Amino acid sequence: LTYGVSVLVISCPCALGLATPVAIMVGNGMGAKKGILFKNATALENTGKAKNIVLDKTGTITTGKPEVTDVIHTGEFTREELLETAYSLENNSEHPLAKAIVQYCEKNHIGKQEVTEFLSETGNGLRGKINDVPVAAGNIEYVKEFTKVSQKYTDDANRLAGEGKTPMYFVSDGKLAGIIAVSDTLKEDSISAVKHLKEMGLNVTMLTGDNKITAQAIAEKVGIEHVVSNVLPDVKEKVVKEQSLDGITIMVGDGINDAPALTRADVGIAIGAGTDIAIDAADIVLVKNQLEDVPKAIRLSKMVLKNIHENLFWAFIYNIIGIPLAAGLWYPFTGIRLSPMFGALAMSLSSFCVVMNALRLNLKK
């Protein structure tokens, strides 16, 4: 009876049951203090196992606050006419680049007209009518549907793109009105964050709706070799899906267009300053809007996983040694047996050790 009670007491799976949840609880608390919010335990565990990471450009690598840098009008339109067309069209869009043009025009006291039959084609451009005159704005492929673009203006756009700017073409009444270039500055910690991600052995990919030349210029500045440009929202999701086949993949973004990819990824990380849809779709939210918090989240996940393994190891060692001892299997050879009282003490100590080992995470930075 004594042996039976001792085995029953010492085999209580408290240490094993506490090994994982206590470490995860401490990890979540540490993350919250650093402005890294894990929505679920799976995200906390998978982040440290990631092999690939996909970064959206606008609002993630860059500040997401672009500004107009160049205004080039054609011979058939004045600068004011180009800006008025641009202001009227872009005022109907919520895209960050559109907001940059609107702010620029408002600052320069440019007038605007009412746009009818407005249509926004995600990833391509805008179209509508101003006083029954058809107008359009977008990338080179999109505006080719409405007008011919001479080599001179194509060269101008390529030059601007090579400087890391995003050129947008504007068409009015079937004629090219001009080009407006917008530039988004890099976040202060983007270069260091990408460097740390690569040092962790992650395959880093940048996604952007910008053209290839602009995308490559930005990628070179931050040290990213793999770039996918001219992407639409569904293409972002496809890229993430393909990378997930090669291992656990993290997607980092902040916009409405990133939501499908964030949902598709094994771990979706939303920048805190992003849209509500992106934040809802993500598994992790970075409150501080800093890209450097991504490698911090990965390091935290790795520490938690290591701690869980340590807890499970010692919990199993405790059971492997304690249960045979409580059952009296060692008594014929050593004369040692464990009373129920000491069995209860050993069980309590094992749980205490697991909890203290998990709390030890708080000592790490």
What positions do the PLM features span?
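Hydrophobic "anchor" residues
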Residues: 16, 60-61, 176
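P-type ATPase nucleotide-binding
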Residues: 72-200, 212, 224-240
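Short hydrophobic beta/alpha edge segments that flank linear recognition/processing sites
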Residues: 28, 67-71, 86
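Ser/Thr-glycine-rich phosphate-binding loops at phosphate-binding pockets of nucleotides
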Residues: 20, 58-63, 208-209, 232
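Asp-based phosphoryl-transfer active-site loop
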Residues: 43-70, 262
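Conserved ATP-binding TGD loop and adjacent catalytic N/P-domain core of P-type ATPases
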Residues: 38, 50, 130-132, 164-166, ...
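Hydrophobic alpha-helical transmembrane segments
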Residues: 1-55, 228-229, 299, 303-365
